[in-house]
């Protein structure tokens, strides 16, 4: 019997509905971790004042370009910029790793007939989190690089690497082995992956647009709300990808 996207969508949403509390807990936890870690790297009020003064001085000088801006900064200001940038990436990656590891472990356990909580899911995935962090970091850098070149390469890489976290979690594969298998399976089942990835990207863009219009919400609260809903959207995609992989992965494919 052929696999249809409608069947997978229905199955994924039913799972999401039945495990809503656990999934929501994981989404909130990941968003809070990202926010709290982000605050550790955000410059304090005095440092922000120095950065603002540097930006104002640069803007009034009539120059343009990020390289010129950085070159005009003091070493202390450059260090703050670098720290904030690295901190933002690191905190976002940690939140993503907790979400991906927790959701995929939850789906695997429930599919096997075991009842576990969201915290138990994170605990069970702990041994995989370092490898998962490396995998997500590499995939994110590749996809962002593709998006910077042109939009299409980034989308293609998003589709090609979409199954790699599922493969790593389900099959205990290494980073590059998971990416290799994902690449082959993704293009062999592209009709089932493209709509899901495009819906995911569209939903995230719409969410950013909506949250950005809610000006009455404090910026920090808006950031947390955006993070939670982004995580819920990603959780639905992860459930879909796990279900899809379980259907398309034959013993021959698993031995690749």
Curated annotation (Swiss-Prot):
The keyword Membrane applies. One of its GO terms (cellular component) is plasma membrane. The chain crosses the membrane at residues 23-43, 89-109, 132-152, 192-212, 221-241. It is a multi-pass membrane protein. Keywords: Cell inner membrane, Cell membrane, Membrane, Transmembrane, Transmembrane helix. Its main location: membrane. The keyword Ribonucleoprotein does not apply. NCBIfam families: PRK02868.1 (NF002774). Belongs to the UPF0259 family. This is UPF0259 membrane protein plu2479.
């Amino acid at each position: 019997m052929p696999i249809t996207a409608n069947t997978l969508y229905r199955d994924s949403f039913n799972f999401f509905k039945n495990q809503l509390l656990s999934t929501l807990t994981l989404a909130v936890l990941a968003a809070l971790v990202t926010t709290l870690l982000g605050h550790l790297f955000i410059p304090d009020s005095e440092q922000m004042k120095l950065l603002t003064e540097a930006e104002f001085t640069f803007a009034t000088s009539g120059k343009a370009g990020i390289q010129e801006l950085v070159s005009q900064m003091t070493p202390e200001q450059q260090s703050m910029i670098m720290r904030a940038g690295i901190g933002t990436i690191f905190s976002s990656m940690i939140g993503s790793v907790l979400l991906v590891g927790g959701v995929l472990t939850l789906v695997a356990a429930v599919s096997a007939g075991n009842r576990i909580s969201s915290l138990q899911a994170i605990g069970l995935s702990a041994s995989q989190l370092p490898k998962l962090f490396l995998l997500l970091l590499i995939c994110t850098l590749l996809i962002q690089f593709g998006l910077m070149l042109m939009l299409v390469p980034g989308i293609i890489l998003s589709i090609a690497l979409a199954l790699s976290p599922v493969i790593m979690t389900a099959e205990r594969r290494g980073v590059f082995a998971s990416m290799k298998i994902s690449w082959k399976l993704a293009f062999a089942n592209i009709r089932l992956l493209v709509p899901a990835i495009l819906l995911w990207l569209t939903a995230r863009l719409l969410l950013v647009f909506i949250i950005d219009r809610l000006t009455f919400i404090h910026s920090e609260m808006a950031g947390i709300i955006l993070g939670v809903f982004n995580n819920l959207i990603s959780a639905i995609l992860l459930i879909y990808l796990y279900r899809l992989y379980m259907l398309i992965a034959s013993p021959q494919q698993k031995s690749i």
